[in-house]
Each structure stands twice: as structure tokens, then as C-alpha cells.
């Protein structure tokens, strides 16, 4: 069995992170994972709560009869002392959920910012000979979160970690994956090079914008994703479900929903993995076009971004199971079969 270290952070910072300035909506994921050779199912998310205890105005799937994924210890798996998880400042709530699923404590790490904006990272426990998993989406502010990830990787490499996996639930710059006109940069390839050169041995990402992004890395990439099963062309009188990898300003998906309503759709649902939610996304999504907007927590969702139609699902169990299988040298692809 390979050694693995999972770090999330007891974070010490000289300035508040973007997340600390507002309450983040969190909730338990409800998934079931079988053996490495059996498929996984994910059917439900538990009620959400805000970090300050207030009840957010976000509905959840309502069926208490659906299964809840048991902790690893209940399935005969004991935590491995060589597996460590660290979290950056971008999404510590998700990192904590992943650690809970794996039955681990987040690793101790110090992250702070100097007055000139430079980032300082120090691991506060040994990772020598360990499998280290660094959980840090490169969501907005993308440049700060990316640089923080690179410095975390470098710190682990210099501390003699055996393997370093960058767990990037949301991969920023993924849309810059090709040249659309002359003299443009392919930033997705550049970011892949930076992560590799910093010292990462592997990348774990959720629902990349395009499959070709995996080819930009010279190291193994585990791609966690969902898949469309069918498409119905005639929507008159039917329930329409719109799927996308991300919602940024929501302009495209709102126009699509308006078209579906004009074509006679009875209800329209929007589902996406990454909720970037740049203005005026919330205004468009809450305008009445959608019966429900279902997203995941690859990017932290702030309370001021909530609206009555919003449902947030957690990817913690899915990422946690993938992390364990990478560490255990088990099949990752069988999760999706």
C-alpha cells in the first residue's frame, strides 16, 4: 500500500481569507461506495446549515429513506498514518468534510500573507515518506489561490513527502484550453506546467471544462465527473434539465432556459458542478426561469449567494473515496461504472 498524507489546514493567516468574511453553506454528502470493483451511487444530500447556525433558505432533496454513506471505519477501513490531508484557504469546509469521510484529522499548516501580498506556507507536522493530498480549488480569486497551491506543493516536496496529489475540485483557467485567435496564450497548459514543476506527482480534479485539459499534464490525472445519459429533443409539456460544467454569469444558461420555456417546457432545472456565480448570475438564476438550480460545493457558496431555488450538493464523499483508492492503489474508474 502506498503511503498517503491528507492535509487540510489549521490555518494561521495574517489577513482574513475570502471565505472568513462571510458564512459558508455546508452540509453532509450522502453517497454509498462499494468495494473497489463495485460501482458507487449518490442519491441524496443532507440538510444544509450555515456556519453560524442560521437556517439558509436553500431546499434539499427530500427523501429520508435514501441511503447515507457510512464512514470508512464502518466499512472495515482504518485510517492510514501515512495518509495526510492539508487544506488551503480556498475551501476549508469541503476539506473538513473529506477528512471526516476518511476518518482523519486535517494536517496542521500555517498560511499567511505579508503586507506586500506575498504568501507564506509552513507545514507544522512531518510529512516525510507520506502520501500528501492538498485540497485547494483555484476558484476566485484565482491567481491568489493558484499561487497558494503552488507554494503548498513546493513546501511538501522540500519536506520529503513521498507522493503529492493536488486535489483541485475547481480547476481555474480551464476555459483557456485552446487558441481562438492569433497571439493568444493557452493558460490551461501553462497552469498544468506550473503545478507539475512545483512538484505535484498527481492531480485529482472535478468535471474539467474539456477532456483535453487532462492531456496538458505530464503527470497522472484522476478526473471525477458526471455523465449525461440521454437527450430528449421535444420538450413541450416536459421537464427539462440543463447540464453544464460551470455557471459563471449565467447568461448562456438563462438564455437556454428562456428558449425551453418558449418551446413549451413545463419546468426547467439547471445542474452544474462549479458555481462561479459572477454578477449578475444570482439575479438571472433567481428570476423565475428555473424550478431548481442544483450545484456542488467545489467552490464555497456564501450565504449572500443563496436564493430559494438553490440546492447545494457536496462532493466530499466522492473525493474522499477517490483519495482513498489512489492511496490504496485501487481502481478509480470503477467508481463511475
Model-inferred region functions:
Residues 1-337:
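PRPP-associated nucleotide enzymes
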Amino acid at each position: 500500500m502506498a503511503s498517503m498524507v491528507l492535509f487540510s489546514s489549521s490555518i494561521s493567516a495574517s489577513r482574513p481569507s475570502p471565505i472568513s468574511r462571510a458564512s459558508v453553506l455546508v452540509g453532509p454528502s450522502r453517497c454509498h461506495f462499494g468495494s473497489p470493483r463495485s460501482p458507487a451511487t449518490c442519491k441524496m444530500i443532507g440538510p444544509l446549515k450555515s456556519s453560524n447556525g442560521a437556517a439558509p433558505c436553500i431546499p434539499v432533496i427530500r427523501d429520508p429513506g435514501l441511503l447515507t454513506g457510512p464512514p470508512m471505519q464502518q466499512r472495515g477501513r482504518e485510517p492510514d498514518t501515512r495518509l495526510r490531508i492539508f487544506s488551503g484557504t480556498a475551501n476549508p469546509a469541503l476539506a473538513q468534510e473529506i477528512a471526516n469521510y476518511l476518518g482523519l484529522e486535517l494536517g496542521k499548516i500555517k498560511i499567511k500573507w505579508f503586507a506586500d501580498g506575498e504568501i507564506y506556507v509552513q507545514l507544522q507536522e512531518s510529512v516525510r515518506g507520506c502520501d500528501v493530498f492538498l485540497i485547494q480549488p483555484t476558484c476566485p480569486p484565482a491567481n491568489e489561490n493558484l499561487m497558494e497551491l503552488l507554494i503548498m506543493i513546493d513546501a511538501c516536496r522540500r519536506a520529503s513527502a513521498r507522493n503529492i496529489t493536488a486535489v483541485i475540485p475547481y480547476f481555474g483557467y480551464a476555459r483557456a484550453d485552446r487558441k481562438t485567435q492569433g497571439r493568444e496564450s493557452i493558460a490551461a497548459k501553462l497552469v498544468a506546467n506550473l503545478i507539475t514543476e512545483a512538484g505535484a506527482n498527481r492531480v485529482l480534479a472535478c468535471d474539467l471544462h474539456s477532456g483535453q485539459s487532462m492531456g496538458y499534464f505530464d503527470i497522472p490525472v484522476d478526473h471525477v465527473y458526471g455523465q449525461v445519459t440521454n437527450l430528449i429533443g421535444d420538450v413541450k409539456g416536459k421537464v427539462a434539465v440543463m447540464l453544464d460544467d460551470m455557471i459563471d454569469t449565467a447568461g448562456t444558461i438563462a438564455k437556454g432556459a428562456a428558449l425551453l420555456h418558449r418551446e413549451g417546457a413545463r419546468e426547467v432545472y439547471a445542474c452544474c458542478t462549479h458555481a462561479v456565480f459572477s454578477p449578475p448570475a444570482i439575479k438571472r438564476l433567481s428570476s423565475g426561469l428555473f424550478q431548481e438550480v442544483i450545484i456542488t460545493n467545489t467552490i464555497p457558496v456564501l450565504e449572500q449567494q443563496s436564493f430559494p431555488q438553490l440546492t447545494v450538493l457536496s462532493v466530499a464523499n466522492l473525493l474522499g473515496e477517490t483519495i482513498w483508492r489512489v492511496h490504496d492503489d485501487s481502481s478509480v474508474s470503477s467508481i463511475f461504472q
